[in-house]
Regions:
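Catalytic helix-loop patch of NAD(P)-dependent Rossmann-fold dehydrogenases
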Residues: 2, 16, 24-70, 81-82
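Conserved sequence/active-site signature of Rossmann-fold short-chain dehydrogenase/reductase
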Residues: 25-26, 76-78, 116
Length: 208
């Protein structure tokens, strides 16, 4: 991040800097949909790293006049992604493995990558002169166990899921408030069930 910023301040025409941050910065303190101006309370090393990057970006903006756009991404998923919960669920359930970490009651906000791309385009097109911080999510929460059950149904699996409840440095509930995102005349089009269905079609195709 710092290398990009150091290069940017040397340019005659200062570029806008777009940074993909994370809603994990909000931490464990909230159970309602989280607004961009709420206090940041990161608990994981990943979130702390994102927080550090945001601080550097905003400092450079203050000192050098760079225009900064910070996008705080929810849980992004979609065809091609080979990590995170949905991919992990496909891998385990298709191979009759049933162990998942956590309680299953953790709540996350899922946004399909195509909806994210549409929002990023809208934000860039606005060409605001001011710095912006925008939540990028669906505004809806889904329990981990419900996501896994959707995957199970897609695989016609009757496997019984077992949760190993270990202490993890990750928030229990993360749901974004997307009022600001919607002000760009944007709204998510792909709901979680449709998104997972399309994802599993892709997953089965690459594993055929």
């Amino acid at each position: 991040t710092k290398s990009v910023l150091d290069f940017s301040i040397q340019l005659k025409e200062k570029p806008r800097i777009i940074f993909m941050s994370s809603y994990s910065l909000y931490g464990n303190s909230y159970t309602n949909s989280i607004k961009e101006n709420w206090a940041l309370k990161p608990v994981s090393s990943y979130a702390l790293t994102k927080k550090s990057s945001e601080d550097i970006l905003l400092k450079y903006s203050q000192v050098y006049g760079l225009k900064i756009i910070i996008l705080r991404l929810a849980s992004i998923y979609g065809e091609g992604l080979k990590k995170q919960l949905i991919f992990d669920s496909c891998e385990k359930i298709s191979n009759n493995r049933n162990i998942f970490y956590g309680t299953g009651n953790e709540i996350r906000d899922w946004l399909h990558v195509s909806d994210l791309c549409a929002l990023v385009y809208k934000v860039i097109k606005k060409n605001s002169k001011n710095n912006m911080i925008v939540n990028c999510g669906s505004g809806k929460g889904s329990k981990v166990k419900d996501i896994i059950e959707i995957v199970k149904k897609q695989f016609n699996s009757r496997i019984k899921i077992k949760y190993v409840n270990i202490k993890q440095k990750s928030p229990k509930v993360l749901i974004t408030n997307i009022k600001l995102a919607k002000s760009f005349k944007w709204a998510p089009k792909i709901n979680i069930k449709k998104g997972i269905s399309e994802y599993i079609k892709w997953y089965k195709k690459i594993n055929a």
